[in-house]
Amino acid sequence: MSQNQVLFTPFQVGALTLPNRLVLAPMTRSRANNEGNVPTDSTVKYYVQRASAGLLITEGSQISQQGVGYIYTPGIYSEAQVAGWKKVTDAVHAAGGRIFIQLWHVGAISHPFFQNGELPVAPSAIKPVGVKAFTANGMEEIPTPRALATEEVKATVEDFRKAAENAKKAGFDGVEIHGANGYLVDQFIQDSTNQRTDEYGGSVENRARFALEVVQAAVDVLGADRVGIRLSPTGNVGGIHDSNRLATFSYVTEQFNKFGLAYLHVIEALPGHPMAAKAGQEPVGPALRKIFTGPFILNGGYTQETAEHALNNNEADLIAFGVPYIANPDLVERYQQGASLNTPDQATFYGGDDHGYIDYPSLQEQGAEAEVKQDIVQY
């Protein structure tokens, strides 16, 4: 087989056989119903349009009201949300697709607006830097959070368990734990945001405990072959960092191996991308690839060419695409046919109506439009 066709070959991920190696990366689009953070009919269409991907991973979906940090983002903790997501999964499956939901708790990156006037929670009372909260009042300053009590940490693990149960009820093929981008799970793992002195802080073994308990909770509900986790070892959202990223994330990954997870999803972008390792910062992804014994997904600024290169060099088993999928719902077909890509409209990435969400044309639609124009010219 030609090396430039690896993207379109099947691959086994946990309980699922994927028809290709393209993954829809989880992307917040802020289009949920603000009355209850419920997915809408437009959400259904958005994911169905992209169902030809090997695997769809939904936007981050909060496991509880406490986990909310942005307006118009969906949850998976209420009956209405479960019902809304069930419409999505039914439609995606009818279209031949496969879909995981990303389970999300923002931790410190929130605002009292979402917390009934209370402070956001975090492993430690450390204020995120360089980020603001997106509320109904616009972008607002994030306050210093309060540290979760030990019993509250354990209760949050149970919130993740309940979210996994709800995901199962909603018909998802599996769940991805959001352990990246400076949110709660990441805040526990890294020592800049975790200065606890109980069983969840201090040593790397203790700092990893919350993440491992969350994974175990999801595995208990769904089975390990339907649970993945996402990490961003070189990310710095909110100023997050670790004194020894390589050692910390290597340890965490070694522990993940004990579960037999569906996959490990790592954000470590290519040079020049905002999420790439910074100058003087060694990439961690290659080390995690060597450690992890299951399917490995890479994400961060990949094109068809760089994705094929990564797959052929065994840097990953699958590649997750974000921005290209926003404007190109039929990205698989466009790559297969060597077709040009639609240009995404950054002004419509977050919030708004269906414009910039579900109105990007597919190749088929563009072809039909071209035929109509040709008819007009001829007649």
Report each predicted region and the residues it spans.
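Flavin-dependent oxidoreductase catalytic cores
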Residues: 1-379
